Amino acid sequence: MLMAFVLVISSTRWGLGQDQQRSFPSDNLASAVLIEDSEGSGSGFFFSYHDAVYLVSARHVLFKPKHLPAGGLSADFEPIAHELTLTSYSQDPSDTSANVFKIDLDAVVQTAVAKYHRSQDVAIVKVAQLVPYSDEERKQNLTIGPTALKAVGVPGVTLQKASRKGLLGVSAENTKRLSETLIGNDIVVMGYPSSIGLADLKQIDYARPLVRRGALAGTNAANKSLVLDCQVFFGNSGGPVFEIDHQGLGYSFNLIGVVSQYVPFANTAGSQTVGVQILTNSGYAIAVPTDFIYELIDR
């Protein structure tokens, strides 16, 4: 099945004279993908690597632990729902048309198109294979560039609607591994925090991703994770984390991880002996580094 969309790779570098009013490239505003199923919603993003396009998200957004017949939970996981709906936008914030995919999660798991990491909170689904256009196709459409690729669908993934200006994806060239990240650098988190606000007040357009700024607070060598000084909420899980680096007179903007969870702050109401422990959002969060995205794809 030919999927009629154009993959647009987000910018990674900009400097003086380039969109000076923004602190990061404007075409990254729509990097996040809204993931909806019968259980709720989460975030993700499209990632281009090895001539394929993948949906990347947190494992717990796409899978849940299997229940054992005798009770308890297995170390294995199963799809969180039978069907997913993905919604994303092009690199142009003024383009209101959306890309909408339907994914048969049972089917893509059976064909190994979907994979999850056993020890890290990350999962992937291949949504398309990228192949060159034929000479005949190029003759019929002179707007096709010499390096342009077309997207060929995979079983279980259906493109229901395509935006006018293409699908925004992150390229493998625009990433940093855990060992390359710089503690203290600014970061940007994007996603769909559906748990914030009151729907009746209509303060937030839940159909569009929100941007949150913060800093890379540290890394956890034992867990191989990133610690973010950036508050996240339910719905942010699976969204991309970008690091901003200073490079001469300009900056670079690279994917460093996937939002996994917030770090709770534990407080005790009442006495220390009989009090009730109350957990609140500390403002810190944990992200899975890009190393494990590559590990899943190459597995």
Task: For each feature predicted by the language model, list its residue ranges.
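Catalytic histidine site
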Residues: S23-D95, N99-D104, A128-L130, S179, ...
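Bacterial N-terminal signal peptides
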Residues: L2-S10
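Hydrophobic alpha-helical segments and helix pairs
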Residues: A98-G166
